[in-house]
Amino acid sequence: MPGGRRGPSRQQLSRSALPSLQTLVGGGLSNGAGLRCRSSSAVGLSAPPLTALITPEPVRHSRIPDLPLDSNLLFETLLLLYLLVALLVQYINIYRTVWWSSYSQPTASTSLNFHLMDAHLAVFIAVMLSRRLVWTLLSEVCVACPASPLCYVLLLVVRVCVLTLCGWVLCWTLLNLFRSHSVLKLLFLGYPFGVYVPLCCLHQDGSPAADCGFADADGADGALLQPRDFLTLLRENLRQQLSGTHTHTHTHTCPPSPELIRSEVQQLKTDFNRRIKEVLFNSLLSAYYVAFLPLCFVKSTQYYDMRWSCEHLIMVWINAFVMLMSHLLPPHYCDLLHRCAAHLGRWQRLEPGSCSNTPQHTWSDSTIWPQGVLVRHSRCLYKAVGPYNVALPSDVSHARFYFLFHKPLRLLNVLIGIECSVVVYQLYSLLRSERWNHTLSLGLILVCNYYVLFKLLRDRLVLGKAYSHPLGSAGLGMKRD
């Protein structure tokens, strides 16, 4: 009414000081007692939404069965056999002949032009492909042998002899290749390692100091930093690439505090990035030496099907990528990432004026936020998406971590989709192939792909039933905080 006393507007009510969610979520209040005490000093203060009074339910995890996994030695053996078969297929594609023609021509008396092949190059490629298997075999022998001075000396002698033999073979092949090829072609032999050193050895995941290749010095409060030894970085990365194994075993303990959850996420994120780096490097290295390097040493007068050879290169890289991903990211490791993502949660950024009538809170790093709560952080408005949210709203890496792993079967479904696409395409190419080398190469590669696809589908079937089971059932022994 004109001249009357105006009451507080709707916007003033919605933006009035509300009790902090720290006192409401997990704060030990019951039936809104704390709210009634605070509301006596605020005129016309409406009750906060129901979601602010609900304590987030403890996160329940599905317990997955123990699936059979290939040992490191068995996996490296299977990977080496696959790469050797792929190398044989590439040589067939390059040096094939019309062997059914008249035998009057010496080059047509066999199915391949063996006189055009470089045996030293083939030996060099085979040694480079077997580096992981040799190192894994030596590591397994060291673990299996008892701890005694005599065994230690014998293992040391065996290691020195094996590594010396491999080095001598590489030097012998390089010397013969140097005599018969130009320096430009020889540069292709070590090109992957020349790229790996500046891209990977100089970048260490983890803390910011480690990212730049620096280590803490023994100064006051660790304020001074020293550059880490380049040879140390190179030795650590080469040992990791040679062995292909991870000595650090991560476990999920359902940490109670948000700080511990974010710390666990950081550790798992660093370990996951290291595994992905290993997968990418080794898959690209395998495809490079198997399918690309033989093409670099083909004589200019030699004719071969460029399209088919490049297609084989892509297929080898995809298959090696899937094999390494399935081995380095096993089901129990993906389940570990999923459990951590369930505790982390995610924030969705909103427009500042989209929820003006909804209570908004100031984000706190020591609070576990329930789903649907609106918080302000760094002058931006965010909405809690997960049922359990402790992530930093402005941290994009937390959002990516939750997106990748909050669904436990996402990575496995992606790998199955990639492998199924490759198998279907190869079957289609096999039906349309008219040349004997195409039929032979597709048949050999498909046998290897069937084994990989079988393991992926088996894991998907078992894990799908385990994760689809109701979480409240006691039959599966559900784990909760």
Swiss-Prot record:
Pfam families: Tmp39. Belongs to the TMEM39 family. The chain crosses the membrane at residues 74-94, 109-129, 150-170, 182-202, 278-298, 313-333, 411-431, 437-457. Keywords: Autophagy, Endoplasmic reticulum, Membrane, Transmembrane, Transmembrane helix. It is found in: Endoplasmic reticulum membrane. It comes from Danio rerio (Zebrafish). It is a multi-pass membrane protein. GO terms for biological process: autophagy; cellular response to cold; negative regulation of autophagosome assembly; negative regulation of autophagosome maturation; response to cold. InterPro entries: Uncharacterised_TMEM39. The keyword Transmembrane applies. Coiled coil: none annotated. GO terms for cellular component: endoplasmic reticulum membrane. Regulates autophagy by controlling the spatial distribution and levels of the intracellular phosphatidylinositol 4-phosphate (PtdIns(4)P) pools. Modulates (PtdIns(4)P) levels by regulating the ER-to-Golgi trafficking of the phosphatidylinositide phosphatase SACM1L. The keyword Transmembrane applies. This is Transmembrane protein 39A.
